[in-house]
Design a protein with these regions (language model features):
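Conserved ATP-binding N-box helix of the HATPase_c
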Residues: 11-27, 86-119
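Conserved beta-strand-loop-beta-strand hairpin that lines the nucleotide-binding pocket
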Residues: 79, 93, 109-138
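Short beta-to-alpha transition helix within the HATPase_c
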Residues: 53-70, 137-141
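Conserved signal-transmission helix
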Residues: 1-3
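Active-site alpha-helix of zinc metalloproteases
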Residues: 8
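Flexible, glycine-/charge-rich segments associated with ATP-binding catalytic modules
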Residues: 26, 140-160
Length: 160
């Protein structure tokens, strides 16, 4: 994607959030403005945790996906003890890609994808959850742990 297009999409998304924040303040809805403000900051903070990982292939796939595919909002939950995830970047990227390709066929409206990364002494656990109005729960991947019309969750365990 051309740099100007990327820049424009990023600015457009941020401008939309700031306009909504401004509207809440203008209408005197301080509670809604405060909640939205905290949500925006938390989203940036959580995304930064992911972007700081030593996983360039996974990060590149994520960035390409958010710029090209407007069907998903993303959330992150990252609790890693070490930088060992960097040793499994190719595996992580393949898992992310597999989940996203599967999820694209299951929703028509904007839906939330939550990526969770947890680490113990023995393994790294990656959980991908799609929540929203899921139209199809048939033929889920083998790594599926939950599948219904509200959530489809896939899990990958990487032994260290």
């Amino acid at each position: 994607m051309h740099n100007v297009e990327t820049y424009m999409k990023t600015k457009h998304d941020l401008a939309n959030q700031l306009q909504l924040l401004d509207a809440y303040f203008t209408l005197g809805q301080r509670d809604k403005a405060e909640r939205l403000s905290k949500n925006i900051v938390a989203q940036f903070r959580d995304e930064q945790q992911f972007l700081k990982l030593n996983c360039p292939k996974s990060i590149q796939y994520y960035v390409d996906t958010i710029l090209d595919e407007r069907l998903f909002e993303w959330a992150f939950e990252i609790e890693l003890l070490t930088s060992a995830i960097g040793n499994y970047d190719e595996i992580l990227k393949a898992f992310i890609q597999t989940c996203i390709m599967d999820y694209k066929n299951r929703v028509d409206t904007k839906s939330l994808v939550t990526m969770s990364l947890f680490e113990t002494d023995d393994e790294i656990e990656c959980i991908f959850a799609l929540t929203g109005n899921i139209k199809d729960t048939s033929n889920v991947l083998l790594s599926c742990t939950i599948a219904n019309d509200e959530i489809i969750e896939y899990k990958l365990e990487i032994r260290k």
